[in-house]
Amino acid sequence: MEISWGRALWRNFLGQSPDWYKLALIIFLIVNPLIFLISPFVAGWLLVAEFIFTLAMALKCYPLLPGGLLAIEAVFIGMTSAEHVREEVAANLEVLLLLMFMVAGIYFMKQLLLFIFTRLLLSIRSKMLLSLSFCVAAAFLSAFLDALTVVAVVISVAVGFYGIYHRVASSRTEDTDLQDDSHIDKHYKVVLEQFRGFLRSLMMHAGVGTALGGVMTMVGEPQNLIIAKAAGWHFGDFFLRMSPVTVPVLICGLLTCLLVEKLRWFGYGETLPEKVREVLQQFDDQSRHQRTRQDKIRLIVQAIIGVWLVTALALHLAEVGLIGLSVIILATSLTGVTDEHAIGKAFTESLPFTALLTVFFSVVAVIIDQQLFSPIIQFVLQASEHAQLSLFYIFNGLLSSISDNVFVGTIYINEAKAAMESGAITLKQYELQAVAINTGTNLPSVATPNGQAAFLFLLTSALAPLIRLSYGRMVWMALPYTLVLTLVGLLCVEFTLAPVTEWFMQMGWIATL
């Protein structure tokens, strides 16, 4: 018997999402306009909370759908305007270009990356040393590449590893649905679960590594570039200005990596199962024997393109997204990928997230129009000069954990610059505030996927459900890093930032503009 029209509509609405989730979203959509009529400020914060809820439930339903419905309603009822949303999208065009082209560009370097990381994984047997290697590699790469690019690299490698073993475990040679475990017997499932734990820990170490390295340079994160421009700093200036905070944080972050692996805390410490190592070793040996001269040329070309990528980003020869586009063009041209459908596959991972980030910019527009952060900014600027640095760091950290890093960093640096230009603070104080804002925006935000775009990208990627990496588990595994990075960063802002910066000036390494 065919179901009723109403039941059919209910089933189609948000598809396979749980009924309670669908009901919650409908309640949000009904309540928001009513509260907006009473208090736009409260309605604005409620919208932010609801959007965070959709992100937290990313595995129930991709946040683009519920978040998009909330954003459309916000524009319709007047919480912001379509014109302001367009302005926010235009202001963040380089971030969108990064997502569209750089992440897609990495897709065409997968062979090289899988080759390198397979060798790394098979040659280092110590889990502590392997975790440290992944963390250091991610930190180094994210000092030159955007964190999203680095995470995209590690995701592609992890999916490759998982796919190799899953095909063996399911006794199928052809491409199968990696989420389908129905053909895997109990013994293989136990090993597969251990392998998932191993990959989860590596992904989290690499993700935190991107935060450790990304905060250090002006090209490491999009907001770093905005802050560097506002302060008038170049690549070397930015690195030295940040180093009184970022170098101690990097050291403590790497020590935390070793500690959680050694003590098996917070879901870390899972080793690579020997059976999986054997499968990966066989795959590596087989790949080496089957590798033709044409395949070797592809690897060499991809390595050369990798050098171009790092060089172009370090020297900032063009916008990050345009450099990514050049990688796509060079990689496809020189490795023989000419079919439109083959090229199109490169964009399947990044475009849903690009759309989600565009929806988030509409929430950012609401935050600006309803002046949700104004009370916090006014409170900070009323404090003493010394207290301002710690307060900027703390409030940046709190807001960055629930909001967009680029937005938070931009808002605070603009407010600080306006205060400097009005004479409320000195140029020297403004430059110290810029460091506090940058480190406060980057370091505590590892607490949740909402704060780090790279973490959110990981959470909503095809890999997350494969290795059972949920929002809650990600927050739990990030907790030791959150505590260490936040507290060490705060202590450095409080005690070492001003004296070390003063010493750099006396040495002539940096100068106030």
Curated annotation (Swiss-Prot):
InterPro entries: Na+/H+_antiporter_NhaB. The keyword Ion transport applies. The keyword Nucleotide-binding does not apply. Keywords: Antiport, Cell inner membrane, Cell membrane, Ion transport, Membrane, Sodium, Sodium transport, Transmembrane, Transmembrane helix, Transport. Its main location: membrane. One of its GO terms (cellular component) is plasma membrane. It is a multi-pass membrane protein. It is found in: Cell inner membrane. One of its GO terms (molecular function) is sodium:proton antiporter activity. The chain crosses the membrane at residues 23-43, 52-72, 97-117, 120-140, 144-164, 202-222, 238-258, 303-323, 348-368, 391-411, 447-467, 475-495. It catalyses: 2 Na(+)(in) + 3 H(+)(out) = 2 Na(+)(out) + 3 H(+)(in). Belongs to the NhaB Na(+)/H(+) (TC 2.A.34) antiporter family. Na(+)/H(+) antiporter that extrudes sodium in exchange for external protons. This is Na(+)/H(+) antiporter NhaB. It comes from Escherichia coli (strain 55989 / EAEC).
